[in-house]
Amino acid sequence: SAFSPVLVVGKKKELRQPVKIKAVNWHHKKRPVELQVGNFPPERYVLTPGINNIETSIPEVTAPCELPIILKEQGKAVSKINEKATPVKKWTVYLVQHTHTDIGYTKPQTEILSEHLRYIDYAIEYCEQTKDYTDDAKFRWTCESAWAVDEYLKNRPEEQVNKLKKYIAKGQIEVASMYFNMSEIVDESSFKTFLQPVKEFRKHGIPSTLAMQNDVNGIAWCLADYLPDLGIKYLWMGEHHYKSQVPFNMPTVFQWESPSGKPILTYRADHYNTGNFWGIEQGDIQKTEPKLLHYLSELERKHYPFDAVGIQYSGYFTDNSPPSIIECKLIREWNEKYAYPKLRSATASEFLDYITKRYGDKIPAYRAAYPDWWTDGFGSAARETAASRKTHSDMTAVEGLLSMAVLKDKCLPQTTHQRIEHIHESLLFYDEHTFGASESVSDPLCENSQVQWGEKSAYAWEAVKRTQMLYETSVGLLQGDLRRGKNPTLTIFNTLNWKRSEMLTVYIDFEVIPRNQFFEITDFQGHSLKVQPIRYRREGCYYAIFAEDIPPMGYKTFEIVFKQPSTDTGTITINNASIENHFYKLQLNPDKGTIQSLYDKELNCELVDSSSPWELGAFIYEKLGNRDQLAQYRLDDYNR
């Protein structure tokens, strides 16, 4: 359309809509012409040979209409077109500058922290540098991850910390509450460490009412319960669209309800670098304008319901980007040129405050999980990822054992709480979303790829090592109170709050149960547990034991009783490659090491799909012909 989707301020301070046309002068000399739009007074121009870009304006259009655009020469029309003019939506674009926090990716992890502390110093400087800018253009910055601010408070002098507090109080710097951008492998209990900085911030008088998750297309549902309890009003989700899909077809504000019904106002934003897709960091309106206006027109086409939109960008088009004031200058220049759309340098909460105030009664509510499928790098490190997940579970048990010790009036070692925090912090550093250096796919053996993986994996193994030692501490506190008998004893703990009967694996030295010695594990009433040896070491054996009725937040002690061998051979029969009991019949393929058949006798049902080209348990090695197909949600160039 010739009618530009912006509004400018006329000479009489009235709003006007620009009209832009291209006129071609085929003559070799200049031609004086008149341009008339609708019934508005004509304006005079001189066309030079070739293509001429002509820009005029008309009073603001308040309803859709079709207007003729006529080019006249010596009073006669030489060209005429009819163009549809529509009212310009009076947009405000809240531009939210942030630094996306990758622990690694652009540089090794050990270099990232010092950079992010420096960025907070820069942000303070830029607040000072833009103090005389118009309010819309003043530097504002949302600190995406609480980790950087938490470390800043520990590593900067009081004078510098006070400057940070000053600009937080003025609303130019905002501190988000979440430690990192998290994957889904972290468990619920670790979020107490994850959200711990909020408490520290409040000790310093620093408010935190926003949670921000970027570059991860989902988030743990338990946070919808936890965040409101901490006084956090808003959740901002900066998506990533590459080889993934996101909920909703446009930016969406909604009340996200937890399983218990607690709401938190949530914004599903577009990509966390959307402003950079427009080239905003280049500071050139001519480059940014068409992309920005196209974006807004697409929102209108999709019936976006608000007159404001929150857009994220970084100072430069990269992760772990330093902040910048280039964009502040562009915002100032834009607002001097256009009345609408209006650009505003803003914090994330400022945008959501506006939406809440103006549209609060029109915001939908959803009670549903918000799962992620973007942080798939963990699949490339099954060993370390399994170690992390197991350690989360182990820490639940260890903390339960320590709680039992406290309930028994045991005195915990002074360093216990520090050790717990260190373990959870190590797990968070492994579980946060960053996986691999930026060149880890194109050059997996380069120094940066190797160094970053070494540091990433070390977090998981550090947590494993320290958890095992903390387990020894907790058991050491309790072992003096455990029941003993004339025979060796085995105590099984249940650190959860319900009675449990489960199978567990126990390692027992040959000094306790000699090799080839027949035995039973019984309670003190003579009831035996089911026990099966799994694998042997030179000095002992691992046993599978089915423990029954272990009391909640308690334990049960059993005796190891030696006995003569039984003549009962059991009810399992093994014939060639077939294993069978009362419940199942399992047929193996010894050539492939797979399962051909698994028949459920109770259900009278075959559980293995015999029509599948791969048997159950088969190893499938798949190679992609190209990675680009992932971004297009298709899979047609591969071999298996």
Give the residues covered by each predicted segment.
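Mature N-terminal, pre-catalytic/accessory segment of carbohydrate-active enzymes
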Residues: 1-102, 110
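An acidic-aromatic substrate-binding cleft motif
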Residues: 77-117, 138, 227, 575-588
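Active-site and substrate-binding clefts of carbohydrate-active enzymes
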Residues: 92-94, 99-102, 250-481, 495, ...
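Metal-dependent polysaccharide deacetylase catalytic core of the NodB/CE4 family, i.e.
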Residues: 103, 134-139, 143-214, 262-271
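Surface-exposed loop and adjacent secondary-structure segments within mature catalytic domains
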Residues: 163-170, 220-283
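Alpha-helical scaffold elements lining the catalytic groove of polysaccharide deacetylases
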Residues: 183-203, 275-300, 633-636
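CE4/NodB-like, metal-dependent polysaccharide N-deacetylase domain
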Residues: 191-229, 294-313
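Catalytic and substrate-binding regions of extracellular carbohydrate-active enzymes
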Residues: 417, 421, 429-640
